[in-house]
């Protein structure tokens, strides 16, 4: 038996191994064949296999070989279609997944932003609270010093406010009682208001604060802010006391001389005049403070003060013009004093058993409203001081404002 050379035996062994690998790969790839549109029904398989290649010297080396089992046309169509379709499908899937990721992350990002903003605001409030907590002792110390410096003004302000609240409550109660009001109580309120005003001006007589009641400047030096506030506050309260005293004088007038209905219109007119007066009486004081003749060191400061004073006057005129309609309506009601109905006949009074539904007593000067309900003139006038409808059927009788007809005085301070 003739022995073959060693290199031939090696090539034969490698050839057998290559054939076995080829068969295995062909069997495994037979289930992955694809039918391409536009090609024949026969499947096409394209494989890349490692095969040995013989060199010129007769040695075998590993390489790649492609085995085509279909026709060239089908093979070319399958390859071109696979090249065209697969990248497109990948890109579309990539875009689709990217879009879904954005859609899914959008609400989460918005929620995260909202939560961050909320946490930042809470953190700012917390830091402010901590700062306030640490600064509270210092604030308390300086506040105590400020109170001690202005203890006189604070005490006078509390006293004036207490006097006003007491007198206003007493006047409203006496107006509500009508014929049963206490003349002695009204006289006491009048004396109390007069004595309080005189005592205040006597205590601070060196400042001549009463000059401001007649739109003149008090005898003070250069006005600072708290000085102007002191003068305006006292003048405002004293002006209210003056008009409250006039209301007490009207209360002392007997009802047969002036009816309660007429008194209500007088109270309303006095209150409108009081508000206008208190709004105007502070103008000279603030005008002097803004110009401040005594502390002008240069022409620029003086011109700046003049500009501020002019702006203040313009704003004051705008406020007066805005209240012009309300004041004119109140003045018209005071001059005309309209009636709510006509005098009722005896037959109309007998239909309701001759008794007023408000006071539950016999009629005194009965009047019939447009809704044909009968009441006492004084009773229905007192009712319409706060209401605009009939007390029985709620029919609108008067659309006009009847504010301040109960004798009350506004607590609003006309500081500026």
UniProtKB/Swiss-Prot annotation:
Polar residues bias locations: 27-45
EC number: 2.3.2.27
Pathway the protein contributes to: Protein modification; protein ubiquitination
GO cellular component, one term: endoplasmic reticulum membrane
Ranges annotated as biased composition (Basic residues): 77-86
Region described as Disordered: spans on this chain: 27-50, 63-116
Lipid bilayer topology: Multi-pass membrane protein
One GO MF term: zinc ion binding
CDD domains: RING-HC_RNFT1 (cd16741)
Keywords associated with the record: Endoplasmic reticulum, Membrane, Metal-binding, Transferase, Transmembrane, Transmembrane helix, Ubl conjugation pathway, Zinc, Zinc-finger
EC category: transferase
Membrane-spanning parts: 146-166, 184-204, 214-234, 237-257, 265-287, 302-322
Region described as Required for ubiquitin ligase activity and for protection against ER stress-induced cell death: spans on this chain: 349-400
An annotated GO BP: protein ubiquitination
InterPro entries: RNFT1/2, Znf_RING, Znf_RING/FYVE/PHD, Znf_RING_CS
Location in or out of the cell: Endoplasmic reticulum membrane
Renumbered zinc finger spans (RING-type): 356-394
Catalytic reactions of this protein: S-ubiquitinyl-[E2 ubiquitin-conjugating enzyme]-L-cysteine + [acceptor protein]-L-lysine = [E2 ubiquitin-conjugating enzyme]-L-cysteine + N(6)-ubiquitinyl-[acceptor protein]-L-lysine
SMART domains cross-referenced by the UniProt entry: RING
Stated role: E3 ubiquitin-protein ligase that acts in the endoplasmic reticulum (ER)-associated degradation (ERAD) pathway, which targets misfolded proteins that accumulate in the endoplasmic reticulum (ER) for ubiquitination and subsequent proteasome-mediated degradation. Protects cells from ER stress-induced apoptosis.
The name this protein goes by in its record: E3 ubiquitin-protein ligase RNFT1
């Amino acid at each position: 038996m003739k022995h073959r050379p060693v290199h031939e035996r090696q090539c034969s062994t490698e050839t057998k191994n290559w054939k076995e690998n080829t068969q295995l790969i062909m069997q495994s790839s037979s289930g992955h064949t694809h039918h391409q549109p536009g090609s024949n029904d026969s499947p096409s398989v394209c494989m890349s296999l490692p095969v040995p290649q013989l060199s010129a010297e007769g040695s075998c080396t590993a390489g790649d070989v492609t085995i085509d089992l279909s026709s060239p046309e089908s093979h070319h169509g399958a390859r071109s279609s696979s090249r065209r379709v697969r990248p497109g499908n990948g890109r579309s899937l990539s875009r689709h997944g990217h879009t879904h990721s954005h859609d899914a992350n959008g609400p989460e990002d918005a929620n995260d932003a909202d939560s961050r903003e909320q946490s930042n605001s809470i953190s700012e409030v917390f830091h402010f609270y901590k700062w306030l907590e640490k600064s509270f002792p210092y604030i308390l110390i300086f506040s105590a010093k400020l109170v001690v410096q202005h203890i006189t003004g604070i005490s006078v302000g509390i006293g004036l406010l207490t006097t006003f609240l007491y007198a206003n409550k007493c006047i409203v109660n006496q107006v509500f009682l009508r014929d049963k009001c206490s003349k002695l109580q009204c006289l006491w309120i009048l004396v109390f208001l007069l004595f309080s005003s005189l005592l205040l001006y006597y205590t601070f007589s060196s400042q001549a604060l009463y000059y401001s009641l007649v739109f003149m400047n008090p005898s003070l030096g250069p006005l600072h802010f708290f000085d102007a506030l002191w003068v305006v506050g006292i003048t405002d309260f004293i002006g209210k006391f003056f008009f409250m005293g006039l209301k007490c004088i009207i209360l002392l007038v007997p009802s047969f001389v002036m009816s309660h209905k007429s008194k209500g219109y007088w109270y309303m007119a006095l209150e409108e005049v009081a508000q206008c007066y208190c709004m105007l009486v502070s103008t000279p004081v603030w005008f002097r403070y803004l110009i401040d003749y005594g502390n002008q060191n240069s022409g620029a400061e003086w011109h700046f003060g003049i500009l501020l004073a002019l702006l203040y006057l313009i704003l004051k005129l705008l406020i007066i013009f805005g209240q012009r309609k309300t004041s004119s309506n109140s003045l018209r009601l005071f001059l005309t004093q309209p009636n709510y109905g006509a005098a009722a006949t005896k037959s109309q009074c007998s239909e309701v058993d001759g008794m007023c539904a408000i006071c539950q007593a016999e009629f005194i000067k009965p009047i019939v409203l447009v809704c044909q309900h009968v009441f006492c003139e004084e009773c229905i006038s007192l009712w319409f001081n706060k209401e605009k409808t009939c007390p029985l059927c709620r029919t609108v009788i008067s659309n006009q404002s009847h504010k301040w007809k109960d004798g009350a005085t506004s607590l609003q301070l006309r500081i500026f």
